[in-house]
Amino acid sequence: MKTIHFDMNKYETHVDLEYLKEHGRVEKISDGVIFCSGLENAALHQAVLIDERHRGVILELNEEFVGIGLIDKTNDILEGMHVGVSGKFIEVDLFEEMAGRVIDTTGKMLYEESEEKPTATSPLFCVTPAIMTIDSVTRPLNTGLAVIDSITPIGRGQRQLILGNRQSGKTQIAVDTIINQHDQNVHCIYVAIGLKAAYIAEVIETLRNHGAMEYSTVVATAASDSLTAQYLTPYAGMAVAEALRDQGKDVLIILDDLTKHADAYRAITLLFNRPPGREAYPGDSFYIHSSLLERAVQMNEEHGGGSITAIPMIETLSDDVTAYIPTNVISITDGQLFLKSDLFNRGQKPAVDVGVSVSRIGGDAQHPIIRKLSKNLTLILSQFEELKELLDFGNALDDGSMKMVSDGRLLTELFKQKILSPLSVTELIVILYAFQNGFLTKIPPANIQTFKDLLLEKAHMHKDFESFSAQIETINELNESHIEMLEEIIREAGRLFS
């Protein structure tokens, strides 16, 4: 057998292995993601630059290629272009004053130009706070919505899901909650994920018109933005929230909505040829939401005492809460508010289905007076829903059952609330006290809204109500003077109404 001798010197091309560790080449482009060779030292979620001008982030690592998602939507990227690792993980820029800003995934100002330089950065992806650094949820975050603050209260540091069909009032609850924080020393962050640009502008305008942008930040990507930008948006919002929390502040973050976030992630993973699972979502869909929402906590005093309260939203189809993403997020959060289209269409706004909605830890943070006045409200509404079905079939009911129906109908009307008109804690106390002590039984349900407006008007005219409101945080129980004041308000409203 003849031996073959190779002359290695004839191969003049020299491969610089060190260069390939930090640099790569675009091999394939596909709908906002690129497949890249090289980048041997690449790490997940590292920021990269394509052709030294297009921003991207590493989202996929395997033996064959490095998968990069493009943050900016562009058609200028070509095969063969240079890809360089920045050496940093993806971050959002922070500024001296975050209130009033509308930013994108990386902290860049939207809708207006700014010469201001960022003062710091915050990583989009980080480890959840250690269990020894967090504290119990003991302080309320009032939404200003009677049905929520009384039956499914939310505490600072809690994760409370809002889910419901399209056009069932989810965003309106979030906007009302933000507006209600005007004097609560809470910094609000509204995160818009893949929504229509006109819709985002409408929400911003509403917040601005009610003075809420003075203590709010908006992190937004529109439906026309890249899939990667939509996927990164909630993490950018949470990164801003963590920076504020580390300053000892209380933060409320609204995630509108995680269904679109999951859809964007599903599209990205399918483009990277990852095997699909249930409903074509990838196997780590639960992880992307749990790793995000578990960053919303109440820190203990040794670690600043700040908090992040997260209110994610999920869009359901035909009120189906058993679908993959809704069940995932329900199991991650501390409770949920389920909005029913049927209730919304009947004029019950907010359209909260009390039978399915729950707040597992918010009761510990509820104001003691509200907690006492709300103790049997869920039972009243549940009994009303059961007995109402019997009435629909023309069944005769005894006097006790008819009283339950009457109370339920009264409470249902009492919980109806106009948009952008949140109630303070003391206003809610007036309303609940009037209901629980039988002052509303003679008022027809159709007139409840008119009487409620009159009741609140008389409350603000009472000489002692302002001082009562100022001291409410330190009052744990109604004394004789408080009860006398409440009954004077109710009697005066009743006298004028009759």
Curated annotation (Swiss-Prot):
Cellular component GO terms, alphabetical: plasma membrane; proton-transporting ATP synthase complex
A GO molecular function held by the record: ATP binding
Family annotation (InterPro entries): ATP_synth_asu-like_sf, ATP_synth_asu_C, ATP_synth_asu_C_sf, ATP_synth_F1_a_nt-bd_dom, ATP_synth_F1_asu, ATPase_a/bsu_AS, ATPase_F1/V1/A1_a/bsu_N_sf, ATPase_F1/V1/A1_a/bsu_nucl-bd
Tree of life domain: Bacteria
Keywords tagged on the record: ATP synthesis, ATP-binding, Cell membrane, CF(1), Hydrogen ion transport, Ion transport, Membrane, Nucleotide-binding, Translocase, Transport
Positions of disulphide bridges: none
Reactions performed catalytically: ATP + H2O + 4 H(+)(in) = ADP + phosphate + 5 H(+)(out)
Site note Required for activity, residues: S357
UniProt topology in membrane: Peripheral membrane protein
GTP-binding as UniProt keyword: no
Main location class: membrane
Compartments (UniProt record): Cell membrane
Assigned EC number: 7.1.2.2
Family: Belongs to the ATPase alpha/beta chains family.
Subunit organization: F-type ATPases have 2 components, CF(1) - the catalytic core - and CF(0) - the membrane proton channel. CF(1) has five subunits: alpha(3), beta(3), gamma(1), delta(1), epsilon(1). CF(0) has three main subunits: a(1), b(2) and c(9-12). The alpha and beta chains form an alternating ring which encloses part of the gamma chain. CF(1) is attached to CF(0) by a central stalk formed by the gamma and epsilon chains, while a peripheral stalk is formed by the delta and b chains.
Record's function text: Produces ATP from ADP in the presence of a proton gradient across the membrane. The alpha chain is a regulatory subunit.
Protein name as it appears in the record: ATP synthase subunit alpha 1
Organism: Listeria monocytogenes serotype 4b (strain F2365)
Lineage: Bacteria, Bacillati, Bacillota, Bacilli, Bacillales
